[in-house]
């Protein structure tokens, strides 16, 4: 495993040095089964699970027998709220439940590193010094800069929490999703075609992730 070097791009389209992507984070073996499991767990945890259908016992009405048991020529019925009646209860319907799955932290980290490795190997990770020049937010400038970096549809922009200029500049851009370094996750990396880090956010992420990588060893 070798560290990958990337150019740091400026808002003016120039190069401002290089950064190293540590091999223990950006050059890992990616397990498709692990990625699938972690993404499924992540999406499941987003579900509210508040769905609820009423059974025949919970539907209002239906307390009396609709007609006598014998002599009518019809099939016997005990309640108009049985599941086969219009307006009746639901049989085997959904009830409130917790969809979250327990996923070990090591698996979550390994999946994230695997997803970032895939993006790095396909040259879909980019590093910028700043999204727009100066301290004035500009959606037009941000859009132009991102389009120069990549022509793909979905872009994940990882910036520092203090970088308000970048956040305001990119928050209304279609296809651009903004995250902070401590929010980076497997699903958003895989959903995005390209990942664009600011230098500040990349350093923050590497410092956090390097500790996790050392713990795995």
UniProtKB/Swiss-Prot annotation:
Reported function: One of the primary rRNA binding proteins, this protein initially binds near the 5'-end of the 23S rRNA. It is important during the early stages of 50S assembly. It makes multiple contacts with different domains of the 23S rRNA in the assembled 50S subunit and ribosome. Forms part of the polypeptide exit tunnel.
Domain of life: Bacteria
Protein name per UniProt: Large ribosomal subunit protein uL4
UniProt key word rRNA processing: no
GO molecular function, one term: structural constituent of ribosome
Protein family according to the UniProt entry: Belongs to the universal ribosomal protein uL4 family.
Pfam families noted in UniProt: Ribosomal_L4
UniProt record, GO biological process: translation
């Amino acid at each position: 495993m070798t560290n990958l070097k990337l150019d740091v791009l400026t808002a003016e389209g120039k190069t401002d040095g290089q950064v190293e992507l540590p091999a223990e984070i950006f050059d890992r073996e990616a397990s498709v089964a692990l990625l699938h499991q972690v993404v499924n767990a992540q999406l499941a945890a987003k579900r509210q699970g508040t769905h609820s259908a009423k059974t025949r016992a919970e539907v209002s009405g239906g307390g009396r027998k609709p007609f006598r048991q014998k002599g009518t020529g019809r099939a016997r019925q005990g309640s108009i709220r049985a599941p086969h009646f219009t307006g009746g209860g639901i049989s085997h319907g959904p009830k409130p439940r917790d969809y979250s799955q327990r996923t070990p932290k090591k698996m979550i980290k390994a999946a994230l590193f695997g997803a970032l490795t895939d993006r790095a190997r396909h040259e879909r990770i980019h590093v910028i010094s700043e999204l727009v020049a100066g301290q004035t937010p500009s959606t037009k400038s941000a859009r132009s800069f991102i389009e120069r970096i990549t022509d793909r549809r979905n872009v994940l922009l990882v910036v520092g929490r203090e970088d308000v200029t970048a956040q305001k500049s990119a928050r209304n851009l279609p296809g651009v999703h903004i995250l902070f370094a401590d929010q980076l996750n497997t699903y958003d990396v895989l959903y995005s075609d390209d990942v664009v880090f600011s230098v500040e956010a990349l350093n923050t992420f590497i410092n956090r992730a390097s500790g996790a990588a050392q713990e795995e060893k």
